[in-house]
Amino acid sequence: MNALMDVISDRKNNPPAEPSYVAKLLRGGTAEIGFKIVEEAAEVVEAADEPGAAGRVHLVKETADLVFHTAVMLGFHGIMWSEVEAELARRFGISGITEKQSRGSASAND
């Protein structure tokens, strides 16, 4: 993930002259990147319903797409993957309901 985040940061700070999918997404900003995240999330859910080994492979690939596009969004906002890892580590061992309540979430029952 660190290597991917480095590439995203480089594309953001030094847009390449040659075509780059990451640079294209970054130019589109939150709207374009967000559209892809929503699209990929739906594909993850669809793949999760597919049976057997082929379904498993499809789920892995779609999840990789979702993580990739999420990483681009993070990079667009100058957030490193290590910050996400730190937040996940902070939450480890805490009930999801308790964690949501600590944020003052109105939807702590979700």
Predicted regions and their residues:
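Flexible "arm" and connector segments at domain edges
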Residues: 1-63, 67-110
